């Protein structure tokens, strides 16, 4: 007999089909099993579309009666942009529901499970729970903290440099690593850089055709000391948002507006204020691809929860060559920020280290 764990892993595989497309909604996959046979399966494709359970029920049809439904996230029990999934499950005659994890959304949070049990449906909760939570880590964080999940990505040489002393950085890593980054961008709703990166690198910041939708390209600059011409100002390729302060260069602001680049003027430009703005724009997870100065600000404010660090087998030297993270004010090694749940993998000739910033992953606050 096929185990509950196997069917739940199938739900996770289905859910991953829509990575980068569901924001601000979670990733949800569902499987309906009659005996040992899968009679229906589906996933939530994007916000506003039916949830994964509904697609699975549609495919199962009459064979859903008396069957077991598997879903990685608790079925909703409220009327949103789509009807409650619990009522559809009840009406279909499902006998048992196996849930990967409870939905952290206060609108759901156990209410879906209670409704199903009230209707006489057997409910099992917590199958492959850790994997289910990891898949929707950005959704869970956003619900809990009312801001997007922050990811900091950088690439450096063996001696810890992200560019030469002359600011040349093309390329620190291999084409394989860069393709991986393009995939990561396709899973994020926004990519953030600072003015220095625009001036030095003139980046494009798209997913280079890896995904269907490019992330919003966000430039942070208090002064608006930005080049008149840049790839980011081409709005036919992807949309760009420039965020600045009231003391900015008004000529540059006017120039950007003429180019139809969206601008936003804040009283005070901080990483936290930016993340709050992106939360209002329905972002689930945001990628920080900035230089060291802005990265240090983002980390210090608790707006980075996860780190992807590429290590390239190169040495370039240079006392003045920039490093990934600027000044954090630490004086002793005991103050260092530790990464948890560390994972490393080889991508081409480079190594990728992935982990979570201790103190920034659970409570959303920096421990600096």
Curated annotation (Swiss-Prot):
NADP(+) binds at residues 155, 171, 197, 201, 291-297. Keywords: Hydrolase, Metal-binding, Multifunctional enzyme, NADP, Oxidoreductase, Riboflavin biosynthesis, Zinc. Residues 2-124 form the CMP/dCMP-type deaminase domain. Binds 1 zinc ion. One of its GO terms (molecular function) is NADP binding. Its cofactor is Zn(2+). It comes from the Bacteria. Its EC number is 3.5.4.26, 1.1.1.193. Zn(2+) binds at residues 51, 76, 85. Residues 1-146 are annotated as: Deaminase. In the N-terminal section; belongs to the cytidine and deoxycytidylate deaminase family. In the C-terminal section; belongs to the HTP reductase family. This is Riboflavin biosynthesis protein RibD. It comes from Synechocystis sp. (strain ATCC 27184 / PCC 6803 / Kazusa). The lineage of its organism: Bacteria, Bacillati, Cyanobacteriota, Cyanophyceae, Synechococcales.
